[in-house]
């Protein structure tokens, strides 16, 4: 009985230590969510405007650019998988990796070979453990991404995409580099503190809705005059467009990671509280039984002495 009581008290101390860790992680994640959410909201207008501007440029001048035109018989598709560097964030990484596997299966059904790029140590470890090739990976900034991080990733993806413009099947073409024909990104969309979901988006070829001569119902159509010419503007803005899309995805993923970690740590803290209460109740019962037994032994001994007289 004494051994059982010592074991229960040891488990109570262990649960208390774990509770301190999970509570600290919960508080840290809570403090980061507001900042991450503010960064997401601040980046959205720029992302929306640059996409709108590129759409207007392409629609107004009917540009024929590699990032706009879908290639015939695409064979390879780059997929950027955005995960976290650390764990303790619930099903955050599992959902992203499941979404990426679904995208891989879809691409293979279409006859396209997925070319994997990763952000975060968790995705890199996932593919390395399964001995699957990762073309390039980035880590160390999943919770606090910067535009410089996004630009580095975007430059790599755009270079691979542009290298694929002259490829013919498995032939690397004139540049000798086997590139890709599509760019995709898998990340976690941040909708609210309580709602985040894994999503897959195609970055390139860019989808452009061409506007005809019809006037919109709610007013006249806006006419734009571009200086310099649309082609020059388009070449200058396209790299920024890809970097902006990647940056927006990194920011949403960072906010989602913090929200998921806060939720997971709060659940772990609550479970630790419940476990400690249950263990204390069991310990109190054991102690009560031990005291009752000791009293019974004392009374029994006293009665035995009285009878012997």
UniProtKB/Swiss-Prot annotation:
GO terms for biological process: proton motive force-driven plasma membrane ATP synthesis. Transmembrane segments: none annotated. GO terms for cellular component: plasma membrane; proton-transporting ATP synthase complex. It comes from the Bacteria. InterPro entries: ATP_synth_F1_ATPase_gsu, ATP_synth_F1_gsu, ATP_synth_F1_gsu_CS. The keyword Membrane applies. One of its GO terms (molecular function) is ATP binding. It is a peripheral membrane protein. The keyword Transport applies. SUPFAM superfamilies: ATP synthase (F1-ATPase), gamma subunit. It is found in: Cell membrane. Keywords: ATP synthesis, Cell membrane, CF(1), Hydrogen ion transport, Ion transport, Membrane, Transport. Produces ATP from ADP in the presence of a proton gradient across the membrane. The gamma chain is believed to be important in regulating ATPase activity and the flow of protons through the CF(0) complex. Belongs to the ATPase gamma chain family. NCBIfam families: ATPsyn_F1gamma (TIGR01146), PRK05621.1-2 (NF004145). This is ATP synthase gamma chain. It comes from Mycolicibacterium gilvum (strain PYR-GCK).
């Amino acid at each position: 009985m004494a051994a059982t009581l010592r074991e229960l008290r040891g488990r109570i101390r262990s649960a208390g230590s774990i509770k301190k860790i999970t509570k600290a992680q919960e508080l840290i994640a809570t403090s980061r969510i507001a900042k991450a959410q503010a960064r997401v909201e601040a980046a959205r207008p720029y992302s929306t405007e640059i996409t709108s501007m590129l759409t207007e440029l392409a629609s107004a001048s009917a540009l024929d650019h590699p990032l706009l035109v879908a290639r015939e018989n695409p064979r390879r598709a780059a997929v950027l998988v955005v995960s976290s560097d650390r764990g303790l964030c619930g099903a955050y990484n599992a959902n992203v990796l499941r979404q990426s596997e679904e995208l891989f299966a879809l691409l293979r059904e279409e006859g396209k070979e997925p070319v994997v790029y990763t952000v975060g140590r968790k995705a890199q470890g996932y593919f390395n453990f399964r001995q699957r090739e990762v073309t390039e990976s980035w880590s160390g900034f999943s919770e606090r991404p910067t535009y410089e991080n996004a630009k580095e990733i975007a430059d790599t993806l755009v270079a691979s995409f542009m290298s694929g413009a002259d490829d013919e099947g498995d032939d690397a073409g004139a540049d000798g580099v086997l590139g890709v024909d599509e760019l995709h990104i898998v990340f976690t969309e941040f909708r609210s503190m309580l709602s985040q979901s894994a999503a897959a988006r195609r970055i390139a070829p860019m989808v452009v809705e061409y506007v005809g001569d019809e006037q919109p119902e709610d007013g006249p159509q806006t006419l734009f005059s571009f200086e310099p010419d649309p082609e020059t503007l388009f070449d200058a803005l396209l790299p920024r467009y890809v970097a902006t899309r990647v940056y927006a995805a990194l920011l949403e993923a960072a906010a989602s990671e913090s929200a998921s970690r806060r939720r997971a740590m709060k659940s772990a803290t609550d479970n630790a509280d419940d476990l400690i209460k249950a263990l204390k109740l069991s310990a109190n019962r054991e102690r009560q039984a031990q005291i009752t037994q000791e009293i019974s032994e004392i009374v029994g001994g006293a009665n035995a002495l009285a009878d012997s007289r």
